[in-house]
C-alpha cells in the first residue's frame, strides 16, 4: 500500500516541474514587438503542468482590444475542445518582453507575468513563468515554446535550439512536444 502511495506522489510530481528555493532571476528580451504578439500561436512544446496535463493540439489566439489583448487558449482532450480566456497586456515598457496575463479556468482567476526569454518577433516565442510556493519554499516553472506554425523550421528552429542549449533557466530535457496529429486534434461533434 505504501508503495502505491509513493508511486502516486511521484506521478503527480512528475506532471509539474518543481525546484527548491526562490524563482530564478530571468531577463526578458528588450526588443519585443507587442504588435507582433497578436494572432495565432501554436504551442509546440511546454513543461508539463497539471492544468494542461491531458491537452493536445494546443494553440492560443491573441486579439487586440485597445492597449491589451483578449487571450483564448485552446486544446483538445479526448475529442473535446477546451478553452481558457482572459486578457494580457505589456508590463511597463512594451519593448520589454514582460506580459501580464489574467486567465480564468476551473472557476478561478489566475494572474501571472509571462517573460519572453527569446523571440524573433515573427515566428517563435520562448516564454517563462515561475510560481513560488511559500509553504514548500520552492517554485514551479512553466515554459512554453510558441510558433506561428505547428512545426518549427528553418531559422526559427535553429534559434530555439540554440537558446535551449545555452539557457540557464530552461531545461530542454523537461520539454514535452505537442501532438498535432489528425487524431489528437480531432474534435468530435
Swiss-Prot record:
Function text: This protein binds the blue pigments bilins.
Family, as annotated: Belongs to the calycin superfamily. Lipocalin family.
Tissues in which the UniProt entry reports expression: Hemolymph.
Biological process, per Gene Ontology: lipid metabolic process; response to reactive oxygen species
Entry keyword annotation includes S-adenosyl-L-methionine: no
GO molecular function: pigment binding
Subcellular location: Secreted
SS bonds (residue pairs): 23-130, 57-185
Organism name: Pieris brassicae
Keyword flag Phosphoprotein: no
Annotated Gene Ontology cellular component terms: cytoplasm; extracellular region
Domain of life according to the entry: Eukaryota
UniProt subunit comment: Homotetramer.
InterPro entries named among the record's database cross-references: Calycin (IPR012674), Invtbrt_color (IPR003057), Lipocalin_ApoD (IPR022271), Lipocalin_CS (IPR022272), Lipocln_cytosolic_FA-bd_dom (IPR000566)
Protein name: Bilin-binding protein
Signal peptide annotation: 1-15
Keywords tagged on the record: Bile pigment, Chromophore, Disulfide bond, Pigment, Secreted, Signal
Amino acid at each position: 500500500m505504501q508503495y502505491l502511495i509513493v508511486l502516486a506522489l511521484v506521478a503527480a510530481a512528475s506532471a509539474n516541474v518543481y525546484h527548491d528555493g526562490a524563482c530564478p532571476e530571468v531577463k526578458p528580451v528588450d526588443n519585443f514587438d507587442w504588435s507582433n504578439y497578436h494572432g495565432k500561436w501554436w504551442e509546440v512544446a511546454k513543461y508539463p503542468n497539471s492544468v494542461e496535463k491531458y491537452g493536445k493540439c494546443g494553440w492560443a489566439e491573441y486579439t487586440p482590444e485597445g492597449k491589451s489583448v483578449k487571450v483564448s487558449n485552446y486544446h483538445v482532450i479526448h475529442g473535446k475542445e477546451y478553452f481558457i480566456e482572459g486578457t494580457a497586456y505589456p508590463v511597463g515598457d512594451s519593448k520589454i518582453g514582460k506580459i501580464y496575463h489574467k486567465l480564468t479556468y476551473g472557476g478561478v482567476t489566475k494572474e501571472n507575468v509571462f517573460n519572453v526569454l527569446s523571440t524573433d518577433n515573427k515566428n517563435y516565442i520562448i516564454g517563462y513563468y515561475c510560481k513560488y510556493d511559500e509553504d514548500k519554499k520552492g517554485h514551479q516553472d512553466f515554459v512554453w515554446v510558441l510558433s506561428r506554425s505547428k512545426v518549427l523550421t528553418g531559422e526559427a528552429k535553429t534559434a530555439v535550439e540554440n537558446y535551449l542549449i545555452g539557457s540557464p533557466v530552461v531545461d530542454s530535457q523537461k520539454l514535452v512536444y505537442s501532438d498535432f496529429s489528425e487524431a489528437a486534434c480531432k474534435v468530435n461533434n
